[in-house]
Swiss-Prot record:
Protein name (database record): Meiotic recombination protein REC8 homolog
This protein's GO CC annotations: condensed chromosome; condensed chromosome, centromeric region; condensed nuclear chromosome; kinetochore; lateral element; male germ cell nucleus; meiotic cohesin complex; nucleus
PTM summary: Phosphorylated.
Taxonomic lineage: Eukaryota, Metazoa, Chordata, Craniata, Vertebrata
Assembly notes: Interacts (phosphorylated and unphosphorylated form) with SMC3. Interacts with SYCP3. Interacts (phosphorylated and unphosphorylated form) with SMC1B. Does not interact with SMC1A. Interacts with RAD51. Forms a complex with EWSR1, PRDM9, SYCP3 and SYCP1; complex formation is dependent of phosphorylated form of REC8 and requires PRDM9 bound to hotspot DNA; EWSR1 joins PRDM9 with the chromosomal axis through REC8.
PANTHER family: MEIOTIC RECOMBINATION PROTEIN REC8 HOMOLOG, SCC1 / RAD21 FAMILY MEMBER
Main location: nucleus
Cell membrane in keyword set: no
UniProt function note: Required during meiosis for separation of sister chromatids and homologous chromosomes. Proteolytic cleavage of REC8 on chromosome arms by separin during anaphase I allows for homologous chromosome separation in meiosis I and cleavage of REC8 on centromeres during anaphase II allows for sister chromatid separation in meiosis II.
Record flagged with keyword Phosphoprotein: yes
Annotated source species: Rattus norvegicus
Chain positions covered by the region annotation Disordered: 247-282, 317-344, 422-444
Top-level taxon in the UniProt lineage: Eukaryota
Amino acid sequence: MFYYPNVLQRHTGCFATIWLAATRGSRLVKREYLKVNVVKTCEEILNYVLVRVQPPMPGLPRPRFSLYLSAQLQIGVIRVYFQQCQYLVEDIQHILEHLHRAQLRIRIDMEEADLPSLLLPNCLAMMETLEDAPEPFFGTMSVDPTLPSPFDIPQIRHLLEAATPEKIREETLPEATPEPRKPDRTLAMVQSPEVITLQEAEPIRMLRIEGEQDLPEISRGDLDLLIAEEDDAILLEERQRGRLLRQRRASPPLDESKEEPRALEGDGLVSSLSPPAPAQVEGIREPLPDQAFPPEVQKMPGWEPGVLLTEVTPPQELRLPAPPSIEKRPPSPQRPPRRRRRGRQLLFWDKETQISREKFEEQLQTGAHCCEYPVVQPPKRKLMSPAELFRTPTLSGWLSPELLALWTHCAQVPPRMLRQRPQLETEETVEEERVADKEERRKTEALSEIEVLREAQEPSGPLMLSSELSLEVAEEEKSRTSFIPPEERWAWIEERQPEPPALPMLPELPEVPMEMPPGPELLSSEAVLRAVALELQANREPDFSSLVPPLSSRKLASRVFYLLLVLSAQKILLVDQQKPYGRLLIRLGPKFP
């Protein structure tokens, strides 16, 4: 292939777009197709083929193209031109669609030429135009349209000033109309057809591709041949059906009762699959005994062409057996009921298409092909012992190893001997507990007396001191729940049996009782009133947190809150809380002493 690289180089070569369109090397866009000048490109290809192009440099041979390259460029020009034509057709179609849509829009604005005919005339403007001429109907809303308009007065000055002709023709004045008179238009001069040289543009013709031919249209003769073949098939089918009918009539009636369901099934299938022509042929083939048709009437009613073609072979003539004559039939006193004609029977490959009733019941009785439903038994309710529940607090894997080890250590069941203590030991322990309770009560009474004396000496001191906080913390530590089960604690108490600590001798004003506050059950409303009075003397707003520190026990807080409710019910104090979980303010009531 002889060519120079600069000829087929993309974006620079003169044949680059045509070469790509011919070889389909890459996809071209619409802009590249429209940039090609088809006429100029064809001339350049012709110059290259005829070796008319000058060499790029003097002394070199003239550029030439091979036959293959020339053919490819010609194909590329055709494809580019075809694509340009297709773009043009699409643009025209797009423009026509826009014009059609614009015409379909409803015009809601009236044209200016139609406005004067639909609106009432402006009488004021007419008077100004006519130099304030009096208008008799000025101010009237409805005017008879047949009245003349001042603008329609004929102007005859130019007729009077013109030369008098020999014979004056009578001119009829035009009828007066409310619309302004339009000026006369000069008729356009119509030219002869010979002078007109404008010709219609030739339509774009598509190139005919060789080897592409349409299928020939079916002729009338081919249709007649197809109809004749179908008629032959129908006749053959009818003959087979007649043979089957004769065989069934010859067979005993028991066989008919067995084959009756099969025939009914065949009738339903034939009615949906077979064409309507066989039913008509059957009606002609088996006429009633009291009807007699001439032989020329016994034709197959159907589509009959108006004019038969000579070159078409006519179909075979239907030869049906002649109906039996009435004279040969023996007279019968009563005509038997007419049997229903059997439809076409379907032929199956298997002799037995379905299982018989006996075999079906036999298979059901054996139970080989069916099984009973298994009876679902409810799961037995498993009762777990307390020991198992203690050993497994949750499902496996849900509890961390540290908590599980702690649970298993504390969930050990003590031995039976430790759980069943003798009755004597229980009585002794009960007596010891009573004695310890009495001693504790005596201590608290002594402490309360000492506290009253100290309050009398130091009235400005707060209700709760740091020693009380430390003792409360000690009480909380004592009241913490132990992870050791009670059975083991009982065993350890019996083994150790610690001696109760000896109480020291208290002087008149000991310092130790200040570290042991009175119990919650010994608090009274008078103590709460004294604490509120102390807060007021210190110019502080009393609230619940000033009476009960945050580290106090729950029992003490509940006791103080109960006493506040009692005092507020007696209208000695007023308790106020502005928002939930907010400060509980304490104010003096009307009955405060």
